[in-house]
């Protein structure tokens, strides 16, 4: 049954993770260049001092990935093609894990992700802050974001205030006249989610939860100090580049740009008159965002675009390939820089930027990013996830690993709905959870 059919606001919410037993979690990362299914075993552990919010050890017991088809710049363009790729990826993961998958946590890149901060306040009359007061102010803030054509993916309280004093993490039992909250809400077009759910359902699977791609990749690639002090995670995928900003242990901003590694490939194919497949190989083997002195002398063979035996490969300098690659990379990084500046969170990001995603592996990218962003830059890989094959330990698998981590941190979210409040933990079908239980777990 569709989770869009029963409630205007109802998106699937994950079941709570018991702190005393293990869980099997299945995730699906749908991207423009690849589709990844992972099956993991989550085992209770003491909370990590380095990795934020990790309450369980994650061990991957099954993984399957296929070259993506039917997705362009994060948007589903061919349901039949994508359905087939999903089936193959899930089947490979099931065979490796020795179990059957019924439902998955899925990432969301399309649908014009929007990130907004909503503020609400209520009068306390000098009384003590009670659980009911928290409920009222949280619902008031979250309800401001409700739109007929958009669905709430994430709603995270980023901070409270009492009588104008900001930066309060837990106001419960404190006294004041005015209680306020700042709520970060990530929304997405409902039609994009419907198409995503439809495609998963056609593969005879159900959607257990949905997570914004920038949130997932940040969860996998950032360490505790970065999440607390402020940092931007830039996920450079094949069709899109997403931005997530974390501070004080919370996701506080997301954004997306319709440029990625595949745009570099198409630039090479056009500029060098070669096939997409050959351009991709050129990018991986010879592509760089930095010129060096020998590039003008080094010659590279470019296969012709046709199949005529009389067509001979052309010879171009490595410098020409680098100039084509560098132009698109610089454009993307300049857009990222401008988006961070426009967001108003540039001071919070400070000097810390983490690059992740498959396109972040391009030679010379960190150095170019440091120059354009004027910040310290490192490449982020999935951390704290055991059992990954060597090929899946790189930045390209950060989103999939972040989806595996997400159930451990989902309890910080709240979702308002028709005068009540959604906990992120329901029965998987959008059932309204008890507010008291959420408040007990959160405070």
Swiss-Prot record:
Pfam families documented for this protein: FtsA (PF14450), SHS2_FTSA (PF02491)
GO BP terms: FtsZ-dependent cytokinesis
Keywords: Cell cycle, Cell division, Cell inner membrane, Cell membrane, Membrane
Gene Ontology cellular component terms for the protein in this record: cell division site; cytoplasmic side of plasma membrane
Subcellular compartments: Cell inner membrane
UniProt cross-references to SUPFAM superfamilies, sorted A to Z: Actin-like ATPase domain
Function: Cell division protein that is involved in the assembly of the Z ring. May serve as a membrane anchor for the Z ring.
Family of the protein in this entry: Belongs to the FtsA/MreB family.
Record text on subunit structure and interactions: Self-interacts. Interacts with FtsZ.
Record-given protein name: Cell division protein FtsA
Organism for this UniProt entry: Agrobacterium fabrum (strain C58 / ATCC 33970) (Agrobacterium tumefaciens (strain C58))
């Amino acid at each position: 049954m569709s989770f869009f059919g029963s409630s205007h606001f109802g998106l699937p919410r994950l079941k709570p993770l018991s702190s005393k037993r293990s869980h099997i979690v299945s995730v699906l990362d749908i991207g423009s260049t690849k589709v990844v299914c992972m099956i993991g075993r989550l085992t209770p552990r003491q909370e990590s001092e380095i990795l934020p919010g990790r309450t369980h050890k994650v061990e991957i017991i099954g993984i399957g990935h296929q070259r993506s088809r039917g997705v362009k710049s994060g948007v589903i363009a061919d349901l039949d093609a994508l359905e087939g790729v999903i089936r193959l990826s899930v089947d490979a993961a099931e065979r490796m894990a020795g179990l059957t998958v019924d439902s998955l946590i899925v990432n969301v890149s399309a649908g014009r992700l929007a990130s907004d901060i909503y503020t609400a306040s209520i009068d306390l009359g000098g009384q003590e802050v009670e659980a009911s007061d928290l409920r009222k102010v949280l619902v008031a803030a979250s309800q401001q974001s409700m739109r007929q054509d958009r669905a709430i993916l994430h709603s995270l309280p980023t901070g409270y205030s009492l009588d104008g004093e900001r930066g309060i993490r837990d106001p419960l039992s404190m006294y004041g006249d005015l209680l306020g909250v700042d709520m970060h809400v990530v929304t997405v077009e409902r039609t994009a989610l419907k198409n995503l759910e439809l495609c998963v359902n056609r593969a005879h699977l159900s959607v257990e939860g949905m997570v914004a791609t920038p949130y997932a990749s940040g969860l996998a690639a950032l360490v505790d100090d970065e999440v607390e002090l402020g940092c931007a995670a830039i996920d450079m995928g094949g069709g899109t580049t997403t931005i997530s900003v974390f501070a004080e242990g919370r996701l506080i901003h997301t954004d997306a740009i319709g440029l990625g590694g595949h745009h570099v490939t198409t630039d090479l194919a056009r500029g060098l008159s070669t096939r997409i497949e050959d351009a991709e190989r050129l990018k991986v083997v010879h592509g760089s965002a930095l010129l060096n002195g020998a590039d003008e002398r080094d010659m590279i063979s470019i296969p012709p675009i046709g199949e005529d035996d009389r067509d001979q490969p052309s010879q171009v300098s490595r410098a020409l390939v680098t100039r084509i690659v560098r132009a698109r990379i610089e454009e993307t990084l300049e857009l990222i820089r401008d988006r961070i500046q426009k967001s108003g969170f540039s001071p919070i990001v400070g000097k810390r930027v983490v690059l992740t995603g498959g396109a972040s592996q391009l030679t010379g990218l960190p150095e170019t990013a440091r120059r354009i962003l004027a910040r310290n830059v490192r490449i982020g890989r999935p951390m704290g996830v055991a059992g990954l094959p060597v090929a899946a330990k790189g930045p390209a698998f950060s989103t999939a690993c972040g989806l595996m981590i997400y159930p451990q941190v989902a309890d910080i979210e709240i979702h308002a709905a028709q005068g009540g409040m959604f906990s992120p933990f329901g029965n998987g079908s959008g059932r309204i959870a008890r507010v008291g239980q959420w408040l007990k777990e959160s405070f």
